[in-house]
From Swiss-Prot:
GO function term, MF aspect, one: ATP-dependent DNA damage sensor activity
Region Disordered, residue ranges: 357-416, 439-460
Record-given protein name: DNA mismatch repair protein MutL
Gene Ontology, cellular component aspect: mismatch repair complex
Length: 655
């Protein structure tokens, strides 16, 4: 007797729900997409217990015809596709016809709907089966209530994260939907508290202000561009608002939020040298294209897509982001509010430290003095170490046993405070990678400042204001002033930028001339590595790296192109071969870029190097003539401004 049998519909729906309905946020996403496809201009979302208890989505869209109610909870039943060819011309957010069937198989669903010319209807569904249908008073649109999510799949319920995390996921989904559809009024309410709401003005920057705050919103730069196949619109935040993960990069295609590694890479390339390693921008990018150029039918969640002509789109994004910042002043303003908050934290920490030391003195009064002094030194080290990676944040810091917010309906901060708390909980707090001045090589430059000055633009940029140098702090930071306030300049970062642009130009021409190595480099490759090297050996030859067989899986390199810096030639060759092994291609542009960064870093003045006033003034003038004077090649800021107003606030001259 055969063993294969067709699964029951309810079981098949539960299996399908495992891909479509992963968590409460998945339900919100699917219902939001349906509301948007129904041409709603207002959508209200209410959740209880972060969506685990209930999710309600109410819209004023076209509603569902009474004749369609019997099919709406069937798998693969949809109004958005008809013929095979429609799959290649999708302009709606939903199209698979799986969402409602999947949701109703793992939750209890009540749906009320009304079209323009019909009486309202209400149906109740459990386990994918319609148990009740009756006429009901309803406004035009659809009202869906999802209760007891995963009530019949306890294994799925077990893997639900904390309520705060789940609310964060929901908030994130609603935020992105609001960004991509600013013409729709959207609100999110959690346990009676308003988390976010938009006014449907049609302006994306207003929605971003609602999500990220006014400070970020006023530093958003609009970008726009076209190719024969793509139209790009978006907003990119200034580098000073960078974050510790990619969560704040929002990419949309025809209004659909997507995740794409190559497009993420294009955005980071557009910010090249403006962001530190491990830092990521806040940005919104929407790409309009013919649907035939994108395949959205890759995964049930519809987050992953396949694109045609990706290289063209990559170059467009890079170009427009670079243009956005090319002529802008990117000197970060010092934030007094953050300093005040930080000082409160430091004061509390210092008081705790003093109390602890006093207690230790009382308990160990018989201990020798030098032992106590040693402990005090260790405490100081621990204290300073704990503050080394302190990073001011725009988010509300969670306090133990105190996550409550104002519930007053008249409070402007009600929903923003809650949302910021949720976003803080959601964000991955990865430590940024910092450049340690002490680790830099102490070699000095072989090129004079006059040589370098001549290599950069002769037309001084107006982006760096003229300022008078007045001093230096710890042989590391230059202090300057003008009528707008005080400026602090990191001398190492400043010279690093100057020399980077000089070396980038110097090694920009790839020639066929070679220089012999005194001692050849030897490389041993595994069998699979050897196959990759042999495949790309011709490309390596073209850039002047000639690998010669040396027996078995060993190869030698005995020369290098003259455009390689002599001191770094060996390291560049090794990096190039490692790059080929990892990426299976040769990237000459990246090699030149890395070489310029390496040389500028090693040959710039270091911290604790005292300069004369005329040397500092000359350094500032050289910086003014560079193309990108605000960050070093690693993305660290070069200049920070303290306005006159901020200085007066520090000394309580103004409030």
């Amino acid at each position: 007797m055969g063993k294969i049998k067709e699964l029951q519909t309810s079981l098949a729906n539960k299996i399908a729900a495992g891909e479509v309905v992963e968590r409460p946020g998945s339900v919100v996403k699917e219902l939001l997409e349906n509301a948007i496809d129904a041409q709603a201009t207002e959508i209200n979302i209410e959740v209880e217990q972060s969506g685990v208890a209930s999710i309600r989505v109410v819209d004023n869209g076209t509603g569902i015809h009474i004749d369609d109610l019997g099919l709406v909870f069937h798998r693969h039943a949809t109004s958005k596709l008809d013929a095979d060819d429609d799959l290649f011309h999708i302009r709606t957010l939903g199209f698979r016809g799986e969402a409602l069937a999947s949701i109703s198989s793992v939750a209890k669903v009540t749906l009320s709907t009304c079209t323009d010319n019909e009486e309202g209807q209400q149906i109740y569904v459990e386990n994918g089966e319609i148990l009740d249908q009756k006429p009901a008073k309803a406004k035009r649109g659809t009202d869906i209530l999802v209760e007891s999510l995963f009530y019949n799949t306890p294994a799925r319920l077990k893997y639900i994260k904390s309520l705060y995390t789940e609310l964060g996921k929901i908030t994130d989904i609603v935020n992105r939907m609001a960004m991509s559809h600013p013409d729709i009024r959207i609100s999110l309410i959690s346990d009676g508290k308003t988390i976010m709401k938009t006014n449907g003005s049609g302006r994306t920057n207003e929605v971003m202000s609602e999500i990220y705050g006014m400070k970020v919103a006023k530093d958003l730069v609009h970008i726009s561009g076209d190719t024969s196949d793509y139209h790009l619109e978006g907003f990119v935040a200034k580098p000073e608002h960078s974050r510790s993960n990619k969560h704040y990069i929002s990419i949309f295609i025809n209004g659909r939020y997507i995740k794409n590694f190559l497009l993420n890479k294009a955005i980071l390339e557009g910010y090249h040298t403006l962001l530190m390693i491990g830092r990521y921008p806040i940005c919104y990018i929407n790409i309009e294209m013919d649907p035939i150029l994108v395949d959205v039918n890759v995964h049930p969640t519809k987050l992953e897509v396949r694109l045609s002509k990706e290289d063209q789109l990559f170059n467009l994004i890079v170009e427009k982001i670079r243009e956005a910042f090319k002529d802008r002043i990117l000197i970060p303003q010092n934030d007094m509010d953050k300093i005040t908050k930080k000082n409160k934290v430091l004061d509390q920490f210092e008081q705790q430290k003093l109390d602890f030391e006093k207690k230790q003195q009382q308990e160990n009064h018989s201990q020798p003095v030098n032992s106590h002094e040693e402990d005090e030194k260790n405490d100081d080290k621990a204290y300073h170490s704990s503050q080394t990676h302190y990073e001011p944040t725009d988010y509300i810091l969670k306090e133990e046993n105190n996550t409550s917010v104002s519930t007053s309906p008249n409070s402007d901060d009600d929903y923003t405070q809650t949302q910021k708390s949720v976003l803080y909980d959601l964000e991955n707090e990865n430590q940024s990678e910092f450049i340690n001045e002490a680790d830099f090589d102490s070699d000095i430059s072989n090129h004079s400042d006059s040589d370098i000055k001549g290599s950069v633009s002769k037309d001084p940029s107006r982006r760096v204001p003229y300022m008078e140098v007045v001093g230096q702090v710890h042989g590391t930071y230059i202090i300057a002033q003008n009528e707008n306030g005080m400026y602090m300049i990191d001398q190492h970062a400043a010279q690093e930028r100057i020399k980077y642009e000089y070396f980038r130009e110097k090694i920009g021409e790839v020639t066929n001339e070679i220089q012999n190595l005194l001692i050849p480099l030897t490389f041993h490759f595994s069998t699979d590595e050897l196959m990759i090297i042999n495949q790309h050996k011709e490309e390596l030859d073209k850039v002047g790296v000639h690998l010669e067989p040396f027996g078995g899986n060993d190869y030698i390199v005995d020369s290098y192109p003259v455009w390689f810096p002599t001191a770094e030639a060996e390291e560049i060759i090794k990096d190039m071969i490692e790059y080929v092994l990892e990426h299976k291609k040769v990237n000459v542009k990246k090699i030149r870029e890395d070489a310029a960064i390496m040389m500028s870093c090693k040959k710039s003045i270091k911290a604790n190097h005292y300069l004369k006033n005329n040397e500092m003034a000359d350094l500032v003038n050289q910086l003014r003539e560079t193309e990108d004077p605000f960050t070093c090649p690693h993305g660290r800021p070069i200049i920070i401004n303290f306005s006159n107003y901020e200085l007066e606030r520090l000394f309580k001259r103004t409030i």
